[in-house]
From Swiss-Prot:
One of its GO terms (molecular function) is manganese ion binding. Catalyzes the thiamine diphosphate-dependent decarboxylation of 2-oxoglutarate and the subsequent addition of the resulting succinic semialdehyde-thiamine pyrophosphate anion to isochorismate to yield 2-succinyl-5-enolpyruvyl-6-hydroxy-3-cyclohexene-1-carboxylate (SEPHCHC). GO terms for biological process: menaquinone biosynthetic process. Its cofactor is Mg(2+); Mn(2+); thiamine diphosphate. Its EC number is 2.2.1.9. The keyword Cytoplasm does not apply. Keywords: Magnesium, Manganese, Menaquinone biosynthesis, Metal-binding, Thiamine pyrophosphate, Transferase. Pfam families: TPP_enzyme_C, TPP_enzyme_M_2, TPP_enzyme_N. It catalyses: isochorismate + 2-oxoglutarate + H(+) = 5-enolpyruvoyl-6-hydroxy-2-succinyl-cyclohex-3-ene-1-carboxylate + CO2. Pathway: Quinol/quinone metabolism; 1,4-dihydroxy-2-naphthoate biosynthesis; 1,4-dihydroxy-2-naphthoate from chorismate: step 2/7; Quinol/quinone metabolism; menaquinone biosynthesis. Homodimer. The gene is menD. This is 2-succinyl-5-enolpyruvyl-6-hydroxy-3-cyclohexene-1-carboxylate synthase. Binds 1 thiamine pyrophosphate per subunit.
Length: 569
């Protein structure tokens, strides 16, 4: 058992870990206070290659790291102490695993002799995240374990890893070095060359994409009437290339809220509502072939269309090998980046422009929305459309789960520019949305808007403390309809059950919550007041909260009314 210079050796291992993570592409480290993680915290504090983010709540910290990783397109490290601090990361780790976001959890832990014996703040941490993280269990630091073994273990665990990795780090006390600097030169001699350079100790080649279709396969696939579906796509996948592909083939491209193309004028963004419309549905029923880029489609009607149609050919393009089709249709799955697949030598379809009428139907719905949403009573869809119209390519838009993202999917406007759109639709929880948006905003300092419901905001209220640290414009728009009013859209057996067990009206406002964290706040109940407040907030360097107060049934009644008009059009 190693006892001499324990604190110093603990810190040395922490320093090696943080240095190698920086070399492996980590740019941000998120830390929560705690004693058992001290070797990691002290190492991170002096690591100049990493931006440090501190928060007292590990659940919010995990989601902040998720947002940082989404927006920076790089792995993010999280440091926590032992015990339930680690467990609080679970929701964020699940979301990251499902959506292939690389988080690296570094958890401080008690040594083996203090586990399962009643020692304070000690739980069984290895494999705590089950299948949702790759697991690495480090022993307590020991001079008999060569530093190159530690470095190569980290390299293998993290290189080419697009999902979470949990590195459990056991440390014996003492944890706080107080001796003069200990000489570890002999111990570090095998990695002297590594110390003199900036590359990782072991370098693994990047994984290449899988087999691509031949020219003959492309020609056969485009023979006939087809549809392109842009599902969930990250900004770095360059989804705009799919617009060029659609124009080259002469096929319509229908777009999900998370595709980065929902507002594009050349796309069929109103597909959810068009599948309500008999003439559009009949036209789409003629399609023989489909190519889906991405997965996790939001619209149930679009999911149903893909499941019910008798496709001659069904292709799906995904960046990683996984199953992303709840209907389990027979298909060919290609592993490739969306923009690379779109840039193949595609010939023009033999049935080019077969669905041109769909473009007019899509535009007609936009006209309907302008009349019946933009110029109607103040409400949630009107607010979301107002925000969407004011986005540029240099901004981020994070859309919360439950009702906000569905309203955006159904009613987003057609515009010439739009923001980079972010969501948490892996597990689709309402937890951690505010913290994730803060991470998105902090990653690059781009102006960021968050649209979030009142229940989601209450769920993550203490992440307003994270928002305080954001120095770029961060506008938190809370749609307060006094409860979980997405349940108005669901077939709950009776209204009393809906009120008592689902909607959960709370009668709360967010002004005092914003004041508690020292954030600028405004409450609005008209579209003119909202636009004035929002446009000002987007010029403000820092976070602000706009609470939009709307009636409980406004959104659900408007959705039903518009659906009725669409069906009759």
């Amino acid at each position: 058992m190693q006892t001499e210079h324990t604190a110093e050796l603990n810190l040395l291992w922490g320093t090696l870990i943080l240095e190698e993570l920086a070399r492996l592409g980590v740019k941000h480290v998120c830390m929560a206070p705690g004693s058992r993680s001290t070797p990691l915290t002290l190492a991170a504090a002096k690591q100049t290659k990493l931006s440090q983010h501190i928060h007292f709540d590990e659940r919010g910290l995990g989601f902040m790291a998720l947002g940082l990783a989404k927006a920076s397109q790089a792995p993010v490290a999280i440091i926590t102490t032992s015990g339930t601090a680690v467990a609080n990361l679970y929701p964020a780790v699940i979301e990251a695993w499902l959506t292939h976001v690389p988080l690296i959890v570094l958890s401080g832990d008690r040594p083996p002799e203090l586990i399962d014996c009643g020692a304070n703040q000690a739980i069984i941490q290895p494999a705590i995240f089950a299948q949702y993280a790759k697991q690495i269990n480090l022993p307590t630091p020991d001079l008999n374990i060569a530093p190159q073994a530690l470095l190569s273990l980290l390299d293998e665990a993290i290189c080419n890893q697009s999902q979470p990795v949990h590195i459990n780090c056991m440390y014996r006390e003492p944890l706080y070095p107080n001796e003069p600097k200990v000489d570890f030169e002999h111990y570090l001699a095998p990695v002297k060359q590594w110390q003199q350079h900036t590359a990782p100790y072991s370098q693994f080649a990047n994984l290449t994409s899988g087999l691509m279709p031949t020219a003959d396969a492309l020609a056969r696939f485009v023979h006939g009437k087809g549809v392109i579906v842009a599902a969930t796509l990250a900004p770095e996948q360059k989804p705009e290339q799919l617009i060029e592909l659609a124009q080259k083939l002469g096929w319509p491209i229908v777009t999900d809220a998370q595709s980065q193309l929902r507002q594009h004028p050349a796309a069929i963004g109103n597909i959810d509502q068009l599948l309500h419309q008999p003439k559009s549905k009949a036209l789409l029923a003629q399609a023989e072939r489909v190519i889906v880029f991405g997965g996790r489609i939001l619209s149930k009607r679009l999911i149903g269309y893909l499941a019910e149609q008798n496709w001659k050919d069904y292709w799906q393009v995904l960046p990683q090998q996984q199953r992303l089709d709840p209907s389990h249709k027979p298909k060919k799955v290609w592993i490739a980046a969306a923009h690379q697949f779109a840039k193949l030598a595609w010939p023009r379809s033999s049935q080019a422009n077969w669905a041109l009428k769909l473009v007019q139907h899509n535009d007609d719905l936009e006209t309907l929305y302008q009349q019946q949403i933009d110029n109607a009573e103040f409400g949630e869809a009107q607010t979301i459309r107002a925000i969407a119209k004011r986005q540029t390519a240099e901004q981020h838009l994070f859309i919360g789960n439950s009702l906000p993202v569905r309203l955006y999917d159904m009613f987003a406007p057609i515009t010439t520019s739009s923001a980079n759109v972010f969501t948490n639709r892996g597990a689709s929880g309402i937890d951690g949305l505010l913290a994730t948006a803060c991470g998105v905003a902090a990653a690059e300092g781009k102006p960021t808007s968050l649209i979030i419901g009142d229940i989601s905001a209450l769920h993550d209220l203490n992440s307003l403390a994270i928002a305080r640290s954001v120095t770029s414009p961060l506008v938190i728009v809370i749609l307060n309809n006094d409860g979980g009013n997405i349940f108005n859209l669901l077939p709950v057996p009776n209204e009393q059950l809906r009120t008592d067990y689902y909607r959960l009206s709370h009668g709360l406002e967010f002004g005092f919550g914003a004041a508690m964290f020292g954030l600028a706040y405004n409450q609005v109940d008209s579209i003119s007041d909202f636009i004035e407040s929002y446009e000002y907030a987007m010029t403000y360097s820092g976070p602000s909260v706009i609470e939009v107060t709307v009636a409980q049934d406004q959104a659900s009644e408007q959705i039903a009314q518009i659906a009725s008009w669409v069906k009759q059009s």
